[in-house]
From Swiss-Prot:
Residues 45-88 are annotated as: Knottin domain. Residues 23-44 form a propeptide. Residues 1-22 form the signal peptide. It comes from Lycosa singoriensis (Wolf spider). It is found in: Secreted. This is U4-lycotoxin-Ls1c. GO terms for molecular function: calcium channel regulator activity; toxin activity. Pfam families: Toxin_35.
Amino acid sequence: MKVLVLFSVLFLTLFSYSSTEAIDEFDSDAEDDMLSLMANEQVRAKACTPRLHDCSHDRHSCCRGELFKDVCYCFYPEGEDITEVCSCQQPKSHKYIEKVVDKAKTVVG
């Protein structure tokens, strides 16, 4: 029984050592691949639409505020049922949350 326990401990030790060697080799290869991909990366961010500007061309292009992204709201002007007007606006709940965070920052320091 003691011999069986001794061999199982020896086997587990060798197995864990061999698996860590394989993981280390895999990590170094993955790091090299990641570095080569990052070197070839190009910036492809498109320009965002500022607050209160027309966003009808792309409703997901509104810029970010201090904490949250602005939302594209679409509506029909009073008296017109045909033309839809869209603009990037900050929701009131986000405005209130940003005010609370600003007040907390000034109080805390």
